[in-house]
Amino acid sequence: MALSVIQACRSLALSTWLLSFCFVHLLCLDFTVAEKEEWYTAFVNITYVDPDTAEVRTEKTECGRYGEHSLKREARGVLAMPAAPHDRHACDPSGRFTPRAHGAWIALISRGNCTYKDKIRHAVGHNASAVVIFNVGSSNPNETITMPHQGISDVVAIMIPEPKGRELVLLMERNITVHMHITIGTRNLQKYVSRTSVVFVSISFIILMIISLAWLVFYYIQRFRYANARDRNQRRLGDAAKKAISQLQVRTIRKGDQETESDFDNCAVCIEGYKPNDVVRILPCRHLFHKCCVDPWLVDHRTCPMCKMNILKALGLTSSAECLNELPLDYELAVGGVALNAMVMSDDVMAGDVGGARDPGVRMGGLPQVLLDSEPLSQDTMPTEQSELQPIASGSSDVSLTTGAGHSDIDTPTDDPKC
């Protein structure tokens, strides 16, 4: 159950990240499709005769901007502005434009006092072929905007900056004939992010972070429980090892024992030979070691240093906790939460084992089958009788046997013994 929950959480977190990334990407693409403004610049080419030098002057700049509903095409003609000095805004439908040309002409109008639609309609009513409105009152003198004039889409209408418009007005007030040629400039696409989309993306991101945070909290809680259960298991195993050690045999080496001979094996822990009056511990596998050397080893490892026999299994104290202790350190990473639940379930079983029970049929529920293959040694095979130790000890030596470290009957050594 824990394994499936962990895998589901991991899959959910990964899927949430991927879906959120794809969603944000598609949402950004939606911005470019739905939230955008397309507008065109206009090249403005003016030609006039300088009255002082009689030279023809031509200026061409990309300073214009087509209106939102304007025809996107070129236009040419003579500039004309409202005749009344007080009505340069062309808000009066009856206002005239001067000078009037016989051919095509373009109206030059100042921004303000009425809508762009009204200005353009009044100029078109006087047969203007195009309308040029120059910006007035903007914080940026060179700013132009895309004029909205819905309903009038059959005429060319552009906006130019205020300085350029003032320049043209001054030329016309000096009675200079100005010819203008308007051509299409650069196409521009301006993208906007809608407020609704920003809120939606923000909410999606918050939900994503909450899911990820919840998964992280769950994951680290599982790891914390696993670490605590493993620590408790180690402490219980240590207590069980101490109880098992108290049931192992202890003897004192005497002069003439075969352990003191030069060809006898040394202690595998300290790599030193046995001397008279040394106290040794005899394990169920019949290997013996210095008591002070092997006891700390058994508390930590619970196995024979030579043959790796498990003393808890040999004495019938094996449990599911011991089997879990033999798992590799990365077992939790390999199987998710199975090890955690198994160790938690094993606490009650271990408590009964440490209390002194030697039930070889102890239940091993929740553990992998591979850990249940090795059965503990039978109590009948344990070397607890002195007669079984005769092949080890010398026939002429005085041997003291004990069955518990707390009930030792060891003679007081006269030499400097080991341990």
From Swiss-Prot:
A GO-annotated cellular component: cytoplasm
UniProt subcellular location: Membrane
Keyword Iron-sulfur recorded: no
GO molecular function: ubiquitin protein ligase activity; zinc ion binding
Swiss-Prot/TrEMBL keywords: Membrane, Metal-binding, Signal, Transmembrane, Transmembrane helix, Zinc, Zinc-finger
GO BP annotations listed: ubiquitin-dependent protein catabolic process
Ranges per topology, Extracellular: 35-197
Topology feature Cytoplasmic, residues: 219-419
PA domain mapped to chain residues: 70-172
InterPro entries tied to this protein: PA_dom_sf, PA_domain, Znf_RING, Znf_RING/FYVE/PHD
Leader sequence residues: 1-34
Name the record gives this protein: RING finger protein 150
High-level lineage: Eukaryota, Metazoa, Chordata, Craniata, Vertebrata
